[in-house]
Amino acid sequence: NARNRFITNLLPLINNATSLRRVISVFIATLEGEIQMDDFQGWHMKLMANRDHAASITTLSLESHHKDNPKVSFVHNFPGVIKSGITRGTSGVVLTALKAVVRIFGSLFYMPAEEAGDRHVFLSTSARYSAGEKDEAAGVPLSVAPDLSFARGTDGKLASGVYSINASGESAGVKVEDALASLRSRGMTQKVMDTINTDIEKALATKTKA
């Protein structure tokens, strides 16, 4: 909810930008799956189901933002395995065991922080992830690297403005595209945004009363 509020507040400024009208949401892209509306916060799900659920909520919310802001491109990406502290404060047998393994062996498979930063600069600036093939604020043109092409969006079309991207900068596969298409066909995008906006309104109302 917080990142959606953040995006909503910044979109008026982003829309008025003369270059690089883009939003990057770093989370668990390319892992989208089923959404369980009866447990929207994911308190009662198993780990993998929660992952799929949260990934789809993030991607569908970006699709909704893009529908209202077609000149802005939106990238949901998975940063890879990096030392970020994302598991701090978590509990449970599985996560505790996982954190112990990572503490011991993490240095063997962590992506260096500098490389992760470089990859995110690319996501933020390359025309590969533009709002469309004729996007005038697309960023660094594809012509600087002849082997690059427009990325495939979450709807399976090239340069369609919303992207689910893995740690290597590649789009989600057909399985994820099919999962998202199924969610859209059931009106899940609107249900997700209605739930997010209701939660935000409740939080703001509580703060106002306080």
Label every PLM stretch briefly:
Residues L11, T30-L31, P79-I82:
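Conserved beta-strand elements of beta-rich interaction domains across eukaryotes
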Residues Q36-A210:
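NAD(P)H-dependent oxidoreductase Rossmann-fold/reductase module
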Residues N1-L10, I24, L47-A54:
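Short alpha-helix in the Rossmann-fold core of NAD(P)-dependent oxidoreductases
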Residues L13-I35, P70-S73:
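Active-site loop of short-chain dehydrogenase/reductase
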Residues N1-T18, E63-K67:
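Amphipathic alpha-helical dimer-interface segment in Rossmann-like NAD(P)H-dependent oxidoreductases
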